[in-house]
Amino acid sequence: GASHATANTLFFVHADTRPIKSFAEDLQIALIKGYKAGCFRYRFDSETFLLKLNSWFTRFNGLFSGGGDQTLFISRDFFNTLGGYDTQFCLMEDFELVKRIKRKTKFHIIPKTMTVSARKYRENSWIRVQLANLFVFTLFHFGVAPEKLKKSYSILLSNGSNA
């Protein structure tokens, strides 16, 4: 992944997230303004009220901000200073890195919106995905081992897709 990238800015995006056309320019503007790391807002490719509600919360820089669906941009130098992703994590790796980012600098949410697939919600239901995410996030917050996080999430969701 990141070790093979050659640019000065790293941009991590899930395969089911569609970047907007202006994302490169938006990243450049954020970096010029002095932000070392951040993400975009997102919306789902679904018009259901509950998914619109989820999307609305991505404008806030709180405890749950910076998860993979929101993407992540970070300067290469800052990424290297932080030691990159913790390779123990194959789930919640984004939240673990963002947690370290927020200890060192302001985390910036670019006020533009990416589109994310709602497939996981269609296959599992909104409530089931929310409860699985909340459960695994709580385990992560209390320091439960990464392999147990992945196992728990796979059990809770029918397709075992990542958070």
Name each model feature, range by range.
Residues 1-3:
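Short, conserved alpha-helix that lines the donor NDP-sugar binding/gating region
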Residues 10:
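Short aromatic/hydrophobic "clamp" motif used to bind/position activated sugar donors
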Residues 14-20:
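The conserved acidic donor/metal-binding loop of glycosyltransferases
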Residues 21-49:
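Conserved donor NDP-sugar-binding/catalytic core segment of glycosyltransferases
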Residues 37-45, 57-77:
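A recurrent flexible, glycine/aromatic-enriched loop bordering the glycosyltransferase active site
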Residues 91-103:
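Short active-site alpha-helical segment characteristic of glycosyltransferases
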Residues 102-163:
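Hydrophobic helical membrane-anchoring modules
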